[in-house]
Amino acid sequence: TRKKRCPYTKYQTLELEKEFLFNMYLTRDRRYEVARILNLTERQVKIWFQNRRMKMKKMS
């Protein structure tokens, strides 16, 4: 069964954006850290970064 879709909090988005500015690609260890700090799954973090990179590609 699928988990209900829930938007990221302002805080989570801000932290993910900060991390993205610092580095567009995460190592496995860093992804684990970010997920733990923001109380998200590693999969959510991974996919957020994928989507963010695509958004950047589209904007350029």
UniProtKB/Swiss-Prot annotation:
A GO term from the CC aspect: nucleus
Top-level division of the source organism's lineage: Eukaryota
Protein name: Homeobox protein Hox-D9
Subcellular location: Nucleus
Primary role: Sequence-specific transcription factor which is part of a developmental regulatory system that provides cells with specific positional identities on the anterior-posterior axis.
Family of this protein: Belongs to the Abd-B homeobox family.
SUPFAM superfamilies on file: Homeodomain-like (SSF46689)
Location of the DNA-binding region in this protein: 1-60
Keywords from the UniProt entry: Developmental protein, DNA-binding, Homeobox, Nucleus, Transcription, Transcription regulation
GO molecular function, one term: DNA binding
Keyword DNA-binding attached: yes
